UniProtKB/Swiss-Prot annotation:
This is Heat-inducible transcription repressor HrcA. It comes from the Bacteria. The gene is hrcA. One of its GO terms (molecular function) is DNA binding. Keywords: Repressor, Stress response, Transcription, Transcription regulation. NCBIfam families: hrcA. Negative regulator of class I heat shock genes (grpE-dnaK-dnaJ and groELS operons). Prevents heat-shock induction of these operons. SUPFAM superfamilies: GAF domain-like, Winged helix' DNA-binding domain. GO terms for biological process: negative regulation of DNA-templated transcription. InterPro entries: GAF-like_dom_sf (IPR029016), HrcA (IPR002571), HrcA_C (IPR021153), WH-like_DNA-bd_sf (IPR036388), WH_DNA-bd_sf (IPR036390), WHTH_transcript_rep_HrcA_IDD (IPR023120). Belongs to the HrcA family.
Amino acid sequence: MLTERQLLILQTIVDDFIGSAQPVGSRTLAKKDEITFSPATIRNEMADLEELGFIEKTHSSSGRVPSEKGYRFYVDHLLAPQNLPTDEIVQIKDLFAERIFEAEKIAQQSAQILSELTNYTAIVLGPKLSTNKLKNVQIVPLDRQTAVAIIVTDTGHVQSKTITVPESVDLSDLEKMVNILNEKLSGIPMAELHNKIFKEIVTVLRGYVHNYDSAIKMLDGTFQVPLSEKIYFGGKANMLSQPEFHDIHKVRSLLTMIDNEAAFYDILRHKQVGIQVKIGRENSSTAMEDCSLISATYSIGEEQLGTIAILGPTRMQYSRVISLLQLFTRQFTDGLKK
């Protein structure tokens, strides 16, 4: 169990190193207003913290830096919530204030804004479309031969595609089809739509649509949509601006992993509910052993729909990042309920 004095010194070392990226020595600590101990006492306490594994010496300096154990203790026991600036809160809330909530568009913009606000790499795993339920479908004619099919799900996903309208299918047929589809399919999971259409809906359509065969072929193409999650990145190259990653050999494997977007699917897909912080070698990939990954899930009720994560150095602004993720996931969850 650390003493109050050791807790204060450890917290000050971590806070200072996060801000400066420079090893922290006893002289630096002695100049801090909150540190009222003598330099000799500070050195003794730092020696004890080093022996306990919370801080470590670097090769190039007499100062100390937090170890992974030190960061973990800091995150678990010493972290204080950080109030975000009003202009950032307004910027984030404005993103989610759109009357029509398009989850994929918001996910993409969220990744970009988070990367700009943190100067780290932001990753957003969008909702898995197969678990979405159909809210409504629209078919909007552009001319006699083409139309735009718009599929909207309960999570705000909007999928649109241009389809060819067979000559034998007239506008009244289109209108009847849309009415039947919305009446019979609203609330059905996207993964079940194709099967339901061709086992049940076709029978209903046969009684209302004149050119039944042509209409069914058009429907088949309309509902062929990708069902897996989409992943969005913001600030892929931001890690290069961090002092600890100026060594290209050190950062190469990390950048390769970031470029291989599929690698993050497994990392983010099965995250536990709430805020999760993985520090250094707690991460499953060796390419991330000098990084911290903070992730948060967003959901509707008890149904977890996606994940928002920030990848940065272990010398990360943990409190600020957690506050940002809490605000984003809260806004995302509220938006999905619209």
